[in-house]
Amino acid sequence: GKNGHLGFIEPSEKWPPNTCYVSELAASTQNHTMILSEQTPPTIGVTLGLKSILDAKEILFIVTGMGKTAAYTKWLTKEITPNLPASILWKHPKVTLVTDL
């Protein structure tokens, strides 16, 4: 996402729990076109935890769309930080990146 989220794991000062994770949806997510069409838009999201994500045999990391260049550029620095949840993917040995940036 534009802020470097991974699933519904939003940027924060510390890493979330390693298991299934429930989070309040960021305003940018709540305003996404796929959610706005819902009669009762969700306010929380459930996503895999970091351990489950990193336990995958292979990860397909897709970064496309407008407004993501800053987060993508920060990701390319390889600094692993909870302020950029997608950065945790640098710890996985087999990530395939697909991007239009």
Describe each model-derived feature in a short phrase:
Residues K2-L101:
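Conserved phosphate- and dinucleotide-binding cores of soluble alpha/beta proteins
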